[in-house]
């Protein structure tokens, strides 16, 4: 299958953002909390239910913790889950919900085992086994929040139904990734489409359209999950080489894709696929968002619910906030704290962008709140 490089599009020059903060939005450092000495690899707000917009979770070591962001700038610990295996190291989390709306928290990491926690009963609900190696990222389908997708070191991506415990699809094989899959994301409106990226330096776009009957079947399956006719999706609809090194984070922005590697920038690009000719198409590089000292892998960015603000940390403990949809890109703020010197592994931006959280290599959570943010 042909791999598409940046030259195979319109050839227009990409708009590059300037690193001078516009001060359109000002944030103040207002809190720090240290969970322990083990690195925190993931942090995320719950955008699935407006009752829980102030709730976020972190993972690090064999612990999953949920918090509430209080209006006075403090944190309140809500729940903590300690995995039975003390050697587990969680790398990723995602919020999901059961068919009745019960909030679920899904976490996975070095053991390659997915844990589904019921936040209402505060108990482990389900455990999914299937991946042959560690899991680097889990994402939830916002249009059907009982569907999750996992990206693994075993070079595969898997689609799961958290309600029935079924592994529905495995994206791997002849056209699959050739090294660890580091990040994955569902398209925000095209329910059939996902994007994945990894250590083979590629971003792959996949379609579930012809396999969708199996997705529907997974909701009504009454036999053992192990007896479900799990299907392989072997060929993506597009393979793009936008970066020359590991690609460790990718997110859809409408029909465009944001992705980053270890070369101090995030790239916004447009994939143009041909439905009738899988594997063929073109890509156009649209914009670049510089991020200084962001040259190590497993640093992930995040956005607010409406994809207005994007926040990303670097290896020196600084956070850069970009106005995603401006052209050229506008740097909203550069967030620092004299005590924050460890690598920021992931950020979390609140629903309206008024609070930005970051989790770091030294086990700390950092919080910045917007100054004079208009309250609803």
UniProtKB/Swiss-Prot annotation:
PROSITE patterns in UniProt: WD_REPEATS_1, WD_REPEATS_2, WD_REPEATS_REGION
Keyword Repeat: yes
Pfam families named among the record's database cross-references: WD40
This protein's record includes keyword S-adenosyl-L-methionine: no
WD repeats mapped onto the chain: 85-127, 130-170, 176-216, 242-279, 291-332, 339-376
Gene3D superfamilies reported in the protein's UniProt record: YVTN repeat-like/Quinoprotein amine dehydrogenase
One cellular component term from this protein's GO annotations in UniProt: chromatin silencing complex
Tissue: Widely expressed.
Keywords annotated in UniProt: Chromatin regulator, Developmental protein, Differentiation, Repeat, Transcription, Transcription regulation, WD repeat
GO biological process: cell differentiation; endosperm development; heterochromatin formation; maintenance of seed dormancy; negative regulation of transcription by RNA polymerase II; post-embryonic plant organ development
InterPro entries: G-protein_beta_WD-40_rep, PcG_WD-repeat, WD40/YVTN_repeat-like_dom_sf, WD40_repeat_CS, WD40_repeat_dom_sf, WD40_rpt
Similarity comment: Belongs to the WD repeat ESC family.
Functional summary from the UniProt entry: Polycomb group (PcG) protein. PcG proteins act by forming multiprotein complexes, which are required to maintain the transcriptionally repressive state of homeotic genes throughout development. PcG proteins are not required to initiate repression, but to maintain it during later stages of development. They act via the methylation of histones, rendering chromatin heritably changed in its expressibility. Involved in the regulation of seed endosperm development, grain filling and seed dormancy.
Quaternary data: Interacts with EZ1. Component of the polycomb repressive complex 2 (PRC2), composed of the core PRC2 components EMF2B, EZ1 and CLF. PRC2 methylates 'Lys-27' residues of histone H3 (H3K27me3), leading to transcriptional repression of the affected target gene.
Note: Plants silencing FIE2 have small and partially filled seeds, and exhibit seed germination before seed maturation. Plant silencing FIE2 exhibit aberrant pleiotropic phenotypes in vegetative and reproductive organ generation, and derepression of some developmental regulators, such as MADS3 and OSH5 genes.
Protein name: Polycomb group protein FIE1
Gene: FIE2
